[in-house]
Amino acid sequence: MSESSQPQAPSYRYEHELNVIDDNYRNYYQVFVYSFCDSNGDGIGDLAGVTSGLDYIQDMGFNGIWLSPIMPSDSYHKYSVKDYYAIDEQYGTMEDFEKLAAECEKRGIKLLIDLVMNHSSNEHEWFKHASKSLRSNPCGAAKDKPCLNDNICPVHDKYIDYYYFTDEKPVGTNSWYRIGSNRWYQAVFSEQMPELNLDNSAVRSEFEKIADFWLEKGAGGFRLDAVKEYFSGNPEKNIEVLNQFMKHCKTVDPKCYVVGEVWESFTNYTKYYSSGIDSVFGFTMAQESGKIAKTINGKGADNSVKSFAQAMVTVEQKLASYSDTAIDAPFIGNHDTNRGAGILGYNETKIKAAAGLLLTMSGSPFVYYGDEIGLSGSGRDENKRAPMIWDSEGTGLTYGPPDMERQENRFAD
């Protein structure tokens, strides 16, 4: 795609003045930036493309946006962060982000950014510094004395405690990878994404400073990735981390909104509301196995409209038992799940009915980009993050993720 042949996304004129209630109950639109809208003809979505689509997003009635990770990363999905204080050059510049944030504020749109606290990239300076120290010999000074080698030392380097390192690979696990000749580090999601040690107060302080930075830049809050993996199998510790982070964010900006991803059962994910977090994604309603799709597909008394109404009441009662400020965050699908159109059999009536159920629920519903036009995508993750279709001319069209299989979009004109 050449820049000359790739025009800007269409300009949707939004002509209605809205009296937006300034609270944290919003209708959110999730944007996977890489695939959303290309503004410069390189085939990759970018922040300027998101800005060009604000009229379209607002015209649908959304007053909140969740951006997938936008920080520098070697991966297309950007969940392996190399620098928490910058914008990935594929997506533009910090000036582009500030412009997007300013446009959102002008329109009364709350802008959330994805914050990955569970792990970083192995190319992050913290990990690179720690790795270099672990490959070095001790400087010879005692731990309570100044380092004689500029903190490049296995005894004095503070960044070693930012991650999980061990001398012997734990038995019965495949989430540990070798570094050097005799050390191992933990990386649950992939070798390139080492786990951060959130039991270390210094790491928590780092993320408080990171939150401060982005709130100052114009973000209205955060979507927290992989919360249940902060301490896998230890929800109490996860909740404790969230509680500290929430107290900090609300002190800095009382209007800050935070939603967490806790991919668990209803009983388990609702417990996280005791942390003081604003919202936790409602997986009980999501995907093919969720209450919305089952109700629309209508099989059995347990999936009747009456049963759905009872489920909504149950959700609100459960949330209220943990927090009087809890806001439900229901959704049908996101970048990790099969597209809504597919789980509803590509039936236009069912797709619209499912959206109707979602948007009548209490709380802050989240809609994945492209679901409003019936985009398809299932199987491997890349397929679920396919290019947004703007028009028949290919305006703003991206290439989509590497290794994405061809998608048949049945509702595209």
Question: What residue spans do the PLM features occupy?
Answer:
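Acidic/aromatic-lined carbohydrate-recognition and catalytic surfaces
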Residues: 1-3, 7-198, 202-205, 216, ...
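Alpha-helical scaffolding within the catalytic cores
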Residues: 12-16, 207-210, 267-268, 308-319
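Loop/helix patches that line or flank the sugar-binding groove of alpha-linked glycan CAZymes
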Residues: 24, 252, 257, 264, ...
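A short acidic-Thr-Gly-centered motif at the start of a beta-strand
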Residues: 101-104, 319-322, 357-361
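Core domains of carbohydrate- and sulfate-ester-processing enzymes
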Residues: 128-189, 291-320, 385-413
